[in-house]
């Protein structure tokens, strides 16, 4: 238990093809009093352009304060490594910071969809074409990639690659699940395909789940429940924390 309404589970298993896989899952009870789901940004700042990057640990340090304690975070959207442009829209606390998608044919798994928390505290995962008609009812938003579970149906088979993954999903009973899958490390964790991620999310009871930025960006942070420090739970494939452009974080109303 990371905090009331926030639980972490680590799963390490060997698949039928003998490849090892290590998964970290955060279960968030969205309807638990004092638990909030938010978009994290570098320096906890509402930025509309000239985007910057920070590690999750640095983002957590800036966002954390009494009665707004960061309990867990995962990395979120993709970005252009040369221009720092974020691929999808960004909303924070109802403020629209960016309301467009940057899709490139050379990067067909990015800028396809978005994740949102509505102003009445409901989760949404939807295709990018649906964003315009919904944007003014959305409180927290980031862009996302391939939808791996669509209304209970596993999807994403078009892209068979095995990689480190970051995934966010939700169930119809008010639970949100952060999941990261380590990869590219032989005998520890190879990673997963989109179809495998969708299967795991469905087994967890999710109805919708979507891929976020993966590879070396795949990272999960928690506030250690005993030591009261921020800790990266997985093993980033870069060998260290990679600074990222935004994150999904869960905060709790604790002193």
Write out the residue ranges for each language-model feature:
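Zymogen propeptides
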Residues: 1-107, 113
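Conserved beta-alpha junction segments in alpha/beta enzyme cores
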Residues: 12-14, 21-25, 143-173
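Beta-strand-turn-beta hairpins that frame and shape the catalytic cleft
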Residues: 21, 31-34, 120-122, 170-177
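Short, solvent-exposed aromatic-acidic interface loops
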Residues: 40-48, 129-134, 181-185
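A short, polar/proline- and glycine-enriched secondary-structure boundary/capping micro-motif
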Residues: 47-51, 134-139, 187-193
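Structural recognition of the beta-strand scaffold that forms the well-ordered cores
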Residues: 71-75, 114-116, 123-126, 167-169, ...
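Active-site-adjacent helix-turn-beta-strand microarchitecture at beta-sheet edges
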Residues: 75-160
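Conserved, well-ordered active-site substructure
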Residues: 83-107, 154-208, 217-255
């Amino acid at each position: 238990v990371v905090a009331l309404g926030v639980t972490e589970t680590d799963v390490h298993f060997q698949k039928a093809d003998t490849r090892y896989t290590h998964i970290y899952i955060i279960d968030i009870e969205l309807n638990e009093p004092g638990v909030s789901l938010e978009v994290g940004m570098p320096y906890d700042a509402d930025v509309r352009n000239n985007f910057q990057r920070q590690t999750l640990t640095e983002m957590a340090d800036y966002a954390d304060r009494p009665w707004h304690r960061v309990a867990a975070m995962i990395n979120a959207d993709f970005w252009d490594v040369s221009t720092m442009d974020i691929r999808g829209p960004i909303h924070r606390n109802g403020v629209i910071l960016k309301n467009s998608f940057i899709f490139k044919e050379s990067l067909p798994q990015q800028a396809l969809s978005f994740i949102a928390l509505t102003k009445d505290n409901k989760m949404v995962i939807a295709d990018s074409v649906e964003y315009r008609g919904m944007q003014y009812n959305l409180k927290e938003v980031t862009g996302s990639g391939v939808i791996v579970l669509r209304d209970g149906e596993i999807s994403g088979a078009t892209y068979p690659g095995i990689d480190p993954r970051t995934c966010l999903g939700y169930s119809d009973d008010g639970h949100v699940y952060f999941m990261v899958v380590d990869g590219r490390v032989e005998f520890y964790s190879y990673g997963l395909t989109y179809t495998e991620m969708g299967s795991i999310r469905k087994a967890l009871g999710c109805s919708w789940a979507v891929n976020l930025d993966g590879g070396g960006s795949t990272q999960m942070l928690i506030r250690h429940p005993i030591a009261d420090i921020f800790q990266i739970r997985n093993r980033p494939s870069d060998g260290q924390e990679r600074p990222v452009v935004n994150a999904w974080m869960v905060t709790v109303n604790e002193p």
